[in-house]
């Protein structure tokens, strides 16, 4: 708000000083200043830019500068510019006016090589570029948002001369809003030497095994369909020895004239899209029908896929996709750069029944162990992704879901460094399958003072004490419930184990 008030204050002072009693004109300009000052902060700053076309002197006809007719084609414009620019380049031509002529050539080529600017010039003449050689940008006039609006006031005069004392309102408002005045200096940017067209990317879904996702894979052959240049016309879209002809609608001007409501209006020719030339149907290539490209459904490419891939990853193969869907005349190929799009390989990783990947570089494996191994400790065998088997020790008292790490056995990070392999223990508790197993579990519960465990066997009160009939009956009924019967070998082995266990506990060294 302070910014707007300052602008209005400065503008009002200048108006009062120079306008004097021309109160009517002063009011009109003041209202314009209020309107533009109110909208100026909302205008995107990027729209205020300095044009590449600069000429502080009188605006020169770009066609005359390049020695061309208005019907000149793009190739003729480019050829004429290169020829004259080489002749008058300041590094080659040491004549005093060579640099000025070189800049005139740049300005002319800047207009005629751009379809939009050329159309504006053909339609409006020098007025399309501010009348003084400065091309109108998005904000109009050399970086000032008020350039085009106040430019016409510079020529306002009365019987006693200009009531504004020669004030240029474009310069005034341009300075107030940080822009340069009309015709302000600035380095010219070099013109684009060619146009670029890039083909569409192609996405391929490729499945890989878990092992290949971890370690990568070489010489993978991918099949896909893509656009290629027509093999008959080499991408021109035309038969050999044929060329575009002048447009029958606009007669080579690229524009059409319409009269509406007494006003003459010009628009881009709908037949040639402003090019001024067109292809005759009989000149179209018989293979691609004038498109310049053809579909190749049997393309293949051999690639190496990197290690450490995960499901959903995309591998980009640059410059191997489709050719641009555009036909380019043979004489314009030097001014057009065509490049293929990319191939995007979307990875789908087959699930492995044993392994999974977490944290990008760690391979996880779940290992089931019985409760006895978890309690007493032991040794287990673990498979690896490579197909090998390794043996690791289980610590006594291992808990459910406890994880151990095996260093440098995970997903490769570099050629020498890998992540870890994580082994997670799953303790399996099985239901007793025989009377012997049940007796041992109950004995363990009794020894460990487990009051919560269900017990059907009651220990004797002393060695040699007879077991009452009721207990024996219950034991027999429990035994009959088990489908698996204890054979003599099992019972003998159990007897020996218990006997040896008692001897070890009591310290008896007898065999």
UniProtKB/Swiss-Prot annotation:
Molecular function terms, GO-annotated: ATP binding; ATPase activator activity; heat shock protein binding; unfolded protein binding; zinc ion binding
CDD domains noted in UniProt: DnaJ, DnaJ_C, DnaJ_zf
Entry annotated with the keyword Chaperone: yes
Keyword Coiled coil part of the UniProt annotation: no
Record gene name: MDJ1
Segments annotated as CXXCXGXG motif repeats: 230-237, 247-254, 269-276, 285-292
Function: Plays a role in mitochondrial biogenesis and protein folding.
Keywords for the protein's UniProt record, in alphabetical order: Chaperone, Metal-binding, Mitochondrion, Repeat, Stress response, Transit peptide, Zinc, Zinc-finger
Additional notes on this entry: Present with 7570 molecules/cell in log phase SD medium.
Organism ancestry: Eukaryota, Fungi, Dikarya, Ascomycota, Saccharomycotina
Cellular localization per UniProt: Mitochondrion
CR-type zinc-finger residues: 217-297
GO biological process, one term: chaperone cofactor-dependent protein refolding
Name of the molecule in the record: DnaJ homolog 1, mitochondrial
């Amino acid at each position: 708000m302070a910014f707007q008030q300052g602008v209005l204050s400065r503008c009002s002072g200048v108006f009062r000083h120079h306008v004097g009693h021309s109160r009517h004109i002063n009011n009109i300009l003041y209202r314009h200043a209020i309107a533009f000052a109110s909208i100026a902060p909302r205008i995107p700053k990027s729209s205020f830019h300095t044009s590449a076309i600069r000429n502080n002197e009188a605006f020169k006809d770009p066609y005359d500068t390049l020695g061309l007719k208005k019907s000149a084609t793009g190739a003729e414009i480019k050829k004429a510019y290169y020829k004259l620019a080489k002749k008058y380049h300041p590094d080659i031509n040491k004549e005093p006016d060579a640099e000025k002529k070189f800049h005139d050539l740049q300005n002319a080529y800047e207009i005629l090589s751009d379809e939009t600017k050329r159309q504006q010039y053909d339609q409006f003449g020098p007025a399309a570029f501010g009348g003084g050689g400065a091309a109108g940008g998005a904000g109009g006039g050399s970086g000032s948002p008020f350039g085009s609006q106040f430019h016409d006031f510079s020529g306002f005069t009365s019987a006693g001369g200009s009531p504004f004392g020669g004030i240029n309102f474009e310069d005034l408002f341009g300075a107030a809003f940080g822009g340069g005045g009309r015709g302000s200096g600035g380095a010219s940017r070099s013109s684009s030497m060619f146009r670029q067209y890039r083909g569409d990317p192609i996405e391929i879904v490729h499945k890989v095994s878990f092992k290949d996702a971890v370690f990568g894979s070489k010489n993978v052959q991918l099949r896909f369909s893509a656009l290629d240049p027509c093999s008959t016309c080499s991408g021109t879209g035309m038969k050999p020895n044929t060329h575009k002809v002048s447009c029958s609608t606009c007669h080579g001007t690229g524009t059409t004239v319409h009269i509406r409501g007494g006003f003459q209006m010009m628009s881009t020719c709908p037949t040639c899209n402003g090019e001024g030339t067109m292809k005759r149907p009989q000149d179209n290539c018989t293979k691609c029908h004038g498109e310049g490209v053809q579909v190749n459904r049997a393309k293949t490419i051999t690639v190496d896929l990197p290690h450490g891939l995960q499901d959903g990853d995309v591998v980009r193969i640059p410059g191997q996709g489709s050719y641009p869907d555009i036909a380019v005349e043979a004489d314009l190929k030097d001014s057009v750069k065509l490049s293929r799009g990319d191939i995007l390989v979307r990875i789908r990783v087959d699930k492995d029944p044993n392994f999974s990947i977490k944290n990008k570089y760690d391979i996880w494996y779940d290992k089931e162990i019985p409760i006895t191994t978890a309690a007493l400790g032991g040794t287990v065998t673990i498979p690896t992704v490579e197909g090998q088997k390794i043996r690791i020790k289980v610590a006594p008292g291992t808990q459910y879901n406890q994880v151990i790490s095996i260093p440098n056995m995970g997903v490769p990070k570099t050629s020498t460094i890998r992540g870890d392999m994580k082994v997670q223990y799953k303790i399996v508790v099985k239901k007793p399958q025989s009377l012997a197993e049940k007796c041992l579990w109950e004995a363990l519960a009794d020894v460990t003072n487990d009051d919560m465990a269900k017990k059907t066997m009651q220990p004797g009160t002393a060695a040699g004490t007879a077991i009452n009939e009721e207990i024996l009956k219950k034991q027999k009924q429990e035994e009959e419930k088990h489908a698996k019967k204890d054979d003599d070998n099992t019972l003998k082995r159990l007897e020996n184990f218990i006997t040896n266990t008692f001897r070890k506990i009591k310290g008896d060294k007898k065999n």
